[in-house]
């Protein structure tokens, strides 16, 4: 059973916030999230951190301005997730408005893997700025070779149409070999990324990454889309200084904030003060009907209203449908949807994304069932081994005895292992790495971690302890990707477990549900629920939840799998909803809940959305 913990907060900070006229409950909530000054809650664009604070942003802007002035050919190299797709769309839309000759290329994860690899660089030479005909030529040559990689190695280099500059978005900081290949072939590389750098930086012409050594940018939490947005701000300022807009209006980069908000939320980066401004402004545009046709279309096919859009819609509605393209097919579909200017074209592609997402859910459900069966079989096997083992000191292995989980099934889908790792991490409250089979005896792994184990740093320890185990890896504190040889799976699993045990304590493995304490009855009202919906909540700035003991006055199943509740507290009755649970509740429950605005037939009412419950004694 998880432990329920109330978030600590500074009473002095809460009192100072309340003294400005802020509701005392809101003051307490914000203080628990590190807010000390009301200025931290400002969402105006004028409060954004200035781009000159970003190392190399102005230098990259000068290089891009020179390239545009010289009619150089630019090619954006994107990542195949939502952050990469939105970053690509921001780069393409902005650069075209600035007058650049630009196209994009996104690696297919199943053929090329992640990032600016040497193979992608060689493909970029053939793609140039005539993508369709070049790709057709490569595909024809591939049919004569054993693999696509062999085809790219063997294909003669035609430098006549190659790009002059490659611009990476949401990748590139670890692409040492890829940048080296680009340099050899006479292409400049401009890296924009937000992932943590390794021991060696690529020899790129310019790198913009808030996490790179020597960058004093105060916010280290920008997503890849946020980084390229800052570069575009710097580029506009550079073009302005050159007199480009002396006789014509400047491009309005604020119209790209819907894309910035989507990528920021979908990539689950921390919503610090700066990111909350970006997300707030993006949501404001979406709600006002000024989003790009692609985002509107995805919301529409999902049955969501743009005017009511929230961070939930970005993270759990639009993001997964966009990601489905990169997981199961080709992220070019998602990028084209975001670049579409026609509502009809955007809607057609949004329907395709929705279909891919439904397929992804089915695959995910099968993989999750397979993973749970595998862990149960391991436990049963260990029990049988213990029962038949008479030697002193025999121990029973269960997944719960481990500090980490590494799982592999040859039938698992490479594009869905990240979601699988996330689901298993939530279930077991342990770092989880799920592997799927790739090519040439390789396994692709995707990991998710918990507080207390920085996943990228843990993988770095594996690499330093046993360099032959990891072919490549990268990521963040809570998510990372890696490649190993299948023959090394068992040894990697054991080594990663050793490192997990050295970094984590048993207390770290206990699931903790954080909430914001109890609410007084007068505060449990519709006005407070509405006030809470006006803030941007997400990773690192969690949506408020509260804890109370209720008597269950009535309960009924709705929609076959949810419970509609009447909950009593101190003589008051509150409407409640418990999703994905249709078994009867006990008479008394201890519940963690959120204040929610329920809209029905044009009217609004307070609803308690139950996040967690356990049986309680009478309150």
Predicted feature residues:
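Single-stranded nucleic-acid-binding OB-fold domains
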Residues: 555-560, 578-583, 596-607
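Structural detector for short beta-strands of small beta-barrel domains
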Residues: 539-559, 591
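OB-fold single-stranded nucleic acid-binding module
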Residues: 488-492, 588-619
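Hydrophobic helix-and-loop "lid/oligomerization" segment in the mid-to-C-terminal part
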Residues: 2, 7-132, 136-140, 144-165, ...
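Conserved phosphate-handling catalytic cores of large alpha/beta enzymes
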Residues: 124-127, 166-269
């Amino acid at each position: 059973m998880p432990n329920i913990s109330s978030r600590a907060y500074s009473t002095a900070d809460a009192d100072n916030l309340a003294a400005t006229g802020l509701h005392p409950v809101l003051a307490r909530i914000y203080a628990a999230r590190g807010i000390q000054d009301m200025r931290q809650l400002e969402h105006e664009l004028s409060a954004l951190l200035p781009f000159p604070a970003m190392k190399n942003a102005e230098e990259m802007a000068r290089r891009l301005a020179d390239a545009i002035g010289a009619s150089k050919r630019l090619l954006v190299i994107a990542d195949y997730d939502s952050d990469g797709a939105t970053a690509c769309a921001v780069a393409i839309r902005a650069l075209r408005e600035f007058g650049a000759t630009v196209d994009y290329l996104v690696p297919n994860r199943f053929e090329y893997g992640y990032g600016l690899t040497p193979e992608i660089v060689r493909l970029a030479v053939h793609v140039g700025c005539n993508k369709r005909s070049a790709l057709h030529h490569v595909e024809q040559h591939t049919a004569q070779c054993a693999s696509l990689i062999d085809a790219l190695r063997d294909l003669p280099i035609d430098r006549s149409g190659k790009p002059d500059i490659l611009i990476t978005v949401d990748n590139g900081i670890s692409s040492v070999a890829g940048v080296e290949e680009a340099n050899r072939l006479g292409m400049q590389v401009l890296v924009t990324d937000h992932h943590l750098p390794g021991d060696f930086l690529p020899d790129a012409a310019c790198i913009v990454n808030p996490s790179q050594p020597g960058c004093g940018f105060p916010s280290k939490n920008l997503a890849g889309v946020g980084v390229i947005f800052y570069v575009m701000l710097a580029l506009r300022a550079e073009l302005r200084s050159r007199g480009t807009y002396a006789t014509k209006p400047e491009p309005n980069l604020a119209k790209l904030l819907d894309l910035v908000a989507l990528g920021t939320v979908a990539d689950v980066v921390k919503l610090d003060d700066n990111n909350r401004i970006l997300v707030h402004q993006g949501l404001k545009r979406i709600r006002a009907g000024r989003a790009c046709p692609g985002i509107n279309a995805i919301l529409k096919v999902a049955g969501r209203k743009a005017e009511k859009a929230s961070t939930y819609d970005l993270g759990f509605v639009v993001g997964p449908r966009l990601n489905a393209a990169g997981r199961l097919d080709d992220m070019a579909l998602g990028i084209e949807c975001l670049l579409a200017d026609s509502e009809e074209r955007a809607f057609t592609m949004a329907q395709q994304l929705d279909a891919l997402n439904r397929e992804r859910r089915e695959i995910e459900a099968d993989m999750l069932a397979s993973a749970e069966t595998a862990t149960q079989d391991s436990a049963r096997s260990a029990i049988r081994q213990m029962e038949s083992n008479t030697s002193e000191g025999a121990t029973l292995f269960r997944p719960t005895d481990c500090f980490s989980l590494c799982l592999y099934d040859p039938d698992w889908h490479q594009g869905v292992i990240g979601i699988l790792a996330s689901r298993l991490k939530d279930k077991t409250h342990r770092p989880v790495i799920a592997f799927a089979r790739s090519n040439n005896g390789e396994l692709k792994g995707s990991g998710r971690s918990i507080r207390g184990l920085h996943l990228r740093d843990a993988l770095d320890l594996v690499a330093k302890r046993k360099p032959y185990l990891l072919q490549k890896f990268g990521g963040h504190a809570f998510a990372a990707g890696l490649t190993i040889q299948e023959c090394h799976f068992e040894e990697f699993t054991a080594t990663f477990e050793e490192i997990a045990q050295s970094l984590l304590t048993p207390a770290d493995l206990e699931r903790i549900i954080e909430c914001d304490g109890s609410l007084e009855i007068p505060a449990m009202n519709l006005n407070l629920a509405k006030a809470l919906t006006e803030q941007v909540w997400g990773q690192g700035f969690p949506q408020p939840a509260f804890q109370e003991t209720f008597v269950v006055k009535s309960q009924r199943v709705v929609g076959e799998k949810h419970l509609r509740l009447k909950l009593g507290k101190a003589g008051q009755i509150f409407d409640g909803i418990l999703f994905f649970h249709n078994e009867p509740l006990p008479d008394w429950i201890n519940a963690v809940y959120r204040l929610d605005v329920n809209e029905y037939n044009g009217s609004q009412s307070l609803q308690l959305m139950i996040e967690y419950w356990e049986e309680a004694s009478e309150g």
